[in-house]
């Protein structure tokens, strides 16, 4: 929904509604601007369904953290998005992501859709596989021995990347 609002100019790159638009769908309620997605007469919950600027701001912060984390990590290991062969989306989150829309708002980097795969509940699947198969368990041990901890909060460029990502899609739009 946010991607559509952004693409159509209903919200700007800061997630604020265009107050000059001549539509009853944009209104101010309790000092917060909101957009009516569905009026209560068309819902089964006896109230309007809305999205407000606080909702959008929270989404922008969350996607900013994801984007800046990826960008910082890649930079710290001397890579860029061009080097990434695959993006794996795990958990329930991944199954609901519309790739095109996620890329429009900067939640995911703009890559070929074939590079993105959904794996569902990867932790549960991994636990089952390693419990049932010795060779998988050995691979897991091998991978864990190659892991390292990377603390984003201790990396100065993370904060710069985060601030730059607090826009739709983000300030790095090349």
Protein language model features and the residues they cover:
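Helical "lid/coupling" subdomains associated with nucleotide-phosphate turnover
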Residues: 1-174
């Amino acid at each position: 929904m946010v991607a559509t609002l952004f693409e159509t100019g209903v919200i700007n790159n800061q997630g604020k509604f265009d107050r000059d638009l001549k539509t009853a769908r944009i209104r101010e309620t309790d000092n917060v601007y909101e957009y009516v997605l569905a009026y209560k007469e068309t819902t089964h919950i006896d109230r309007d369904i809305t999205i407000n600027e606080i909702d959008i701001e929270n989404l922008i912060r969350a996607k900013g953290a994801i984007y800046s984390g990826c960008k910082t990590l890649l930079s710290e290991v001397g890579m860029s998005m061009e080097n990434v062969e695959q993006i794996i989306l795990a958990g329930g989150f991944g199954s609901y992501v519309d790739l095109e829309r996620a890329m429009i708002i900067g939640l995911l980097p703009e890559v070929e859709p074939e590079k993105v795969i959904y794996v569902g509940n990867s932790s549960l699947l991994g636990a089952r596989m390693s419990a049932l198969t010795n060779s998988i368990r050995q691979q897991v041990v091998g991978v864990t021995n190659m892991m390292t901890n990377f603390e984003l909060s201790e990396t100065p460029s993370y904060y710069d990347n985060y601030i730059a990502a607090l826009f739709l899609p983000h300030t790095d739009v090349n």
